[in-house]
């Protein structure tokens, strides 16, 4: 059975059996090698595409990212290592119903994070109830005593949150971590989508893919709601 590579990813020949380690969930195919429902159309497209042509377009994407400086740094070593953003021509497809369920769960999680922070900087009921050890908060470098009693606009402390998710099975997701202090990576997502649109426009004409280009507008609107507003001179 043939296998091919796009960047650092490895895929089984779409015409053959699946070679994904059984310990991991295969996003694209079921255990019988048939495509999962969200990937049915993409799988049909992939099987008729020319392998050399696909690899060439993958190289074009990497060349574009390198030329335009779309990279990220890996810190923690003696020197920062600049790398290209991961680009995969086999997309991770999430169906609309699945996305709606994830959205509700993520929104609930972010509300819980903000409620926790509001309690920590106000009544501290979660500490008095013994649910969270006091020392865990008091000795945490991220805890700011000067914020005690401060009420941010809308009671929102975490304005932008990056939730790292991993799928472990059909309709089963887990949160790896909540990036709530300095989340990053949105620009990579925007550039990735723009590159996919340029290299594979036919995929977007055949499938109803939700746009991501409106993210900057939504971000601006969200941040605008958090501004402190001072009374107008006419109101005084």
Provide a role label for each language-model segment.
Residues 174-207:
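Extended active-site and interfacial segments that coordinate phosphate-rich ligands
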Residues 147-182:
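Conserved metal-phosphate-binding beta-hairpin within the catalytic cores
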Residues 228-235:
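Conserved small/polar residues in nucleotide/adenosyl-binding loops
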Residues 57-143:
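Low-complexity, highly charged intrinsically disordered N-terminal segments
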Residues 195-227:
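Short N-terminal or domain-adjacent regulatory/targeting segments
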Residues 14-30:
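Short acidic, Pro/Gly- and aromatic-enriched capping/linker segments at domain boundaries
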């Amino acid at each position: 059975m043939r296998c091919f590579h796009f960047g650092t990813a490895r895929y089984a020949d779409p015409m053959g059996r699946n070679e994904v380690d059984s310990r991991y969930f295969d996003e694209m195919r079921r255990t019988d090698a048939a495509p999962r429902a969200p990937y049915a159309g993409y799988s049909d497209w992939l099987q008729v595409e020319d392998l050399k042509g696909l690899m060439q377009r993958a190289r074009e994407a990497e060349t574009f990212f390198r030329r335009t400086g779309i990279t990220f740094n890996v810190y923690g070593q003696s020197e920062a290592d600049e790398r290209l953003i991961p680009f995969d021509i086999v997309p991770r497809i999430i169906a609309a119903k699945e996305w709606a369920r994830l959205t509700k769960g993520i929104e609930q999680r972010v509300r819980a994070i903000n409620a926790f922070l509001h309690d920590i900087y106000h009544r501290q009921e979660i500490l008095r109830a013994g649910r969270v050890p006091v020392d865990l908060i008091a000795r945490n470098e991220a805890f700011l005593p000067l914020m005690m009693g401060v009420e941010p606009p809308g009671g929102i402390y975490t304005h932008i949150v990056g939730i790292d998710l991993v799928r472990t099975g059909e309709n089963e997701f887990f949160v790896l971590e909540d990036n709530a202090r300095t989340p990053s990576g949105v620009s990579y997502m925007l550039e990735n989508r723009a590159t996919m649109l340029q290299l594979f426009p036919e995929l977007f004409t055949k499938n109803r893919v939700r746009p991501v280009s409106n993210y900057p507008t939504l971000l601006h609107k969200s941040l605008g709601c958090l501004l402190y507003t001072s009374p107008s001179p006419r109101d005084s």
